[in-house]
């Protein structure tokens, strides 16, 4: 049980997680060292609306001036993180919630002054994660990071990819509400970078699946060897520990 697995669960999925999801995490934990990274977009948007603060995104990244960062921090590091931790523990999975600024876990470089406090992962303090895992806890990470004693928002997909790359994880699993990439109604079990580009060009991959596969491609570029896109509302783990869904790698695929 030396391999790490990073599980990324988007904010829109958190309310859809059922007993099956937590059973899958238990199965993964029997064979791997598990880290969970979560998003929180819908809850952040709702809180910003309550505060009469505009929601603005550019190229998929949330524009994050100081007033927005305060709300992002409150939601991600507070209610969203703790709800997921409590849900895991309700299913007898010991978890510790922490944010990327705790123990300097996620250090970032600012993306651009134009979009405010948004950062890209530049360094991961893996000793903190390994310490928690060695004490049999699942680290549950809120994707904010630190630079020069300021807190920055991090896209949850790239935060998960950065953590997976730093841990040399066996796999990064994206939890979604679909079975994976479909081609002519059938699940594409294995694919690679070039095939995904072809699928997008030919319209095989459309709509909400496009950002998911783009996140997978970005993860490959960051050094992650294997990414799986799975349906978190169904059993997505084989007895062998392999994922049921679409697996994306750099190499040539056999579909």
UniProtKB/Swiss-Prot annotation:
A Gene Ontology biological process term = arginine biosynthetic process via ornithine
Q: Which GO terms describe its molecular function?
A: acetylglutamate kinase activity; ATP binding
Recorded metabolic or biological pathway in which this protein acts: Amino-acid biosynthesis; L-arginine biosynthesis; N(2)-acetyl-L-ornithine from L-glutamate: step 2/4
| Alphabetized Gene3D superfamilies for the sequence | Acetylglutamate kinase-like (3.40.1160.10)
The highest taxon in the source lineage is Bacteria
Q: Is Isomerase a UniProt keyword of this protein?
A: no
Indicate where this protein is primarily found. Answer: cytoplasm
Residues under site feature: Transition state stabilizer? 8, 212
The EC code for this enzyme is 2.7.2.8
Give binding positions for substrate. Answer: 40-41, 62, 153
Q: Which reaction does it catalyse?
A: N-acetyl-L-glutamate + ATP = N-acetyl-L-glutamyl 5-phosphate + ADP
Kindly state which keywords UniProt assigns to this record, in alphabetical order. Answer: Amino-acid biosynthesis, Arginine biosynthesis, ATP-binding, Cytoplasm, Kinase, Nucleotide-binding, Transferase
Whether Transmembrane counts among this entry's keywords is: no
Main function:
Catalyzes the ATP-dependent phosphorylation of N-acetyl-L-glutamate.
Q: Which PANTHER family match?
A: N-ACETYLGLUTAMATE SYNTHASE, N-ACETYLGLUTAMATE SYNTHASE, MITOCHONDRIAL
Tell me which family the UniProt entry assigns to this protein: Belongs to the acetylglutamate kinase family. ArgB subfamily.
What is the protein's given name?
A: Acetylglutamate kinase
Species annotation = Bacillus thuringiensis (strain Al Hakam)
Lineage, uppermost ranks = Bacteria, Bacillati, Bacillota, Bacilli, Bacillales
């Amino acid at each position: 049980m030396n391999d790490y697995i990073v599980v990324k669960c988007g904010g829109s999925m958190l309310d859809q997680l059922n007993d099956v999801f937590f059973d899958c995490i238990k199965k993964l934990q029997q064979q791997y060292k598990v880290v969970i990274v979560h998003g929180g977009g819908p809850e952040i948007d709702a809180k910003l609306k309550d505060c009469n603060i505009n929601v603005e995104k550019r190229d998929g990244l949330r524009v994050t001036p100081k007033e927005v960062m305060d709300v992002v921090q409150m939601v991600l590091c507070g209610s969203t993180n703790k709800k997921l931790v409590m849900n895991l523990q309700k299913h007898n999975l010991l978890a510790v919630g922490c944010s990327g600024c705790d123990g300097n876990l996620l250090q970032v470089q600012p993306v651009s002054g134009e979009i405010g406090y948004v950062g890209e992962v530049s360094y991961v303090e893996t000793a903190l994660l390994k310490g928690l895992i060695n004490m049999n806890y699942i680290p549950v990470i809120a994707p904010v990071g630190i630079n020069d004693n300021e807190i920055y928002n991090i896209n949850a997909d790239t935060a998960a990819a950065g953590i997976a790359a730093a841990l040399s994880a066996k796999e990064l699993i994206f939890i979604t509400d679909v079975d994976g990439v479909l081609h002519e109604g059938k699940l594409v079990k294995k694919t690679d970078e070039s095939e995904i580009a072809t699928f997008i060009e030919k319209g095989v991959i459309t709509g909400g699946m496009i950002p998911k596969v783009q996140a997978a491609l970005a993860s490959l570029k960051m050094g992650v060897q294997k990414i799986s896109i799975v349906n978190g509302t169904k059993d997505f783990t084989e007895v062998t520990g392999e994922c049921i869904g679409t697996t994306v790698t750099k190499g040539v695929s056999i579909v």
